[in-house]
Amino acid sequence: MEFNKLQLSHCISFYISDVSEVFFESINQHPSRDFVNNILQKIKSTLSEEELEKLNTIEEVTKDEKILIMLNHVLKKIVSKTGSSSCDLFQIVKHDRFNEPVYIQSVNAFENNLINNEFAERRYDYLIEINKHSYLRKYVNAIRISFFLDLRAQILSGSFTLDVINKQLEHQNKEELFQAIYLRSLIKHFISNQLYPISLNSFIFGDKNRENKTVENDKLSVLKNNWNQIFFSKYFDFVAKNKEERVVDNNCDELFYATMNTLLIMLIIIEELRVYFNSKEPALILKLLDNKVSLREDPDQNPETDLHELIKFAEKNYLEKEKTSRWHKKRVKSLEELLEEIKQINLETKNESLAYPDEIVELELDNVHNFVSTKQVFRHQLDLQTLHGIVINPERYGIGMWSNHFVDWEEFKDLIEQITDAENGSDLYGFEKDLDESICQVNKKYLTFISSDSSSFLIIKNDQTKVISNYVWAQLYFETRRWIINDIEYDLYEKGFDKSHFASNIALLESLNFNWLDPFYGLTSIKEIMQKIDSKSNLKTSIAEMVAKFKHEQRISKKDNERVLMIFAYVAAAVVGFINFFSMVFTILTVSDLNAGLTPANIVVIAIASLLALFLIVIAVLFRFRWKYIKH
């Protein structure tokens, strides 16, 4: 049994809220492509020019080819600010009717069957291939953008799938394979721990003086120094012992800028999607794109300059109008303080952020006809057992995303050599237990496995069957929901319960709830995967508990309001009582003879009235303090 091909992808989810009603009207207007291509064309001939123009406007805003043009325009903006005249960051797919380059293509991952056609209209899948001569190739080979217009939740759920390893392994050294996996794990560890949350604020802080780059440079230097410290101590000091220092430094720098620039490119794409899908008039944006727009500047820049240009571009286009927060540079003396500053600024801005990177590893094997038993496939295959362990239980190998001590390459290599040495034997019982717990799907063409926290998948297949798309969309479905819950919990932790948002949060969470009759974006093939993910993560239970929590707080809030009204009622009664009391006293005492009103009967009445007034005061004070205590 030989390894034929290995592909490792990082899936990074996002969502965009407040999607304009125009897009859902467009979807409802033409629920399927067959309707558009056949029936709608006949209807158009009976409409007036005004009705026809309105119909075309609504129809076009969700068309796959129109979204592709919009996304390509974003990529053209990025290309105009980066790279060189001889090497763009992205591979050119073709040229459009204006002879302008097209850097993105649509991906048809699933058959467009008639039953689930209404969901296919809301699924978008695109691929951006990285230029093989670009420094971005140090980190990523291709970027896949997948998103879905969720009519029920009124959001756009999406993910970026980064193809970070794509190797033919026919003559590949196994050590080189594990080295590539180790390096990508180290990058994921850095991103998750140093750049959380992954947002524009991780790269940009506002400053009144746009020409003053001190703030930006200081912050980037913190990240860059931390990167150098981690990557040299964990990796480059061991793999580049016999190489020139200049070459090693250059490799480390290029990898840093490739990673940072890739993240920035994704964030810029999200912001452009947000601008478009939040727009009340998206048709106006499309009309502008129908004209020839040439943005090519062809700068000759190095990767560091690209990073600064992308930051400047993002700051000008996405932060300048709504960003008022400034970075308190004097307050930031360490990375922890830097991350805290980012967190506070994120609370004050509306820009979207990315989820943690999830991992999908797809391995193609040679000389395997059908998978009959998982244990039979793994028996006596120490390399395969090791790969399973690294992907499904990376913490055991010291390369987990949250590992307290991330092992260096030398330690990791020694551990792999020890495990894959047949003379040392293997803990077959322990491995089979892990295997049984991690099984997700068993098919004669492929086997799939899932980690305990649902953040990693391993796909083992015996031919070129396309399996990864199912897992990309399953992770998108799951991670979007988990990410929204995390955002709500984060706001609760930082801001407390906001009574004005109770109803909207409850409605959003209930729209995200699901059962096993859910259409799952019209992809029935991901239902089994979602069941396995939920068994590990308890996503359904988490949503239900969050809804119950908000409803409980809503009931408490209503009771608080009732108590406030009660206090006001007592205060009003007290005021009326005092007025009546003093009216009565002055009525009794206003006589010509001062002693005439002081009869036993009048004194008793005044005493009783005074006592009742005192009771009213005591009750009002007690309720006031009790209400403050309950609120606290």
From Swiss-Prot:
A GO CC term attached to the entry: plasma membrane
TM annotation in the entry: 255-275, 506-526, 566-586, 603-623
Residues in the signal sequence: none
Keywords: Cell membrane, Membrane, Transmembrane, Transmembrane helix
Subcellular location: Cell membrane
Main location: membrane
Keyword set includes Hydrolase: no
Domain of life: Bacteria
Membrane topology: Multi-pass membrane protein
The protein, known as: Uncharacterized protein MG242 homolog
Organism: Mycoplasma pneumoniae (strain ATCC 29342 / M129 / Subtype 1)
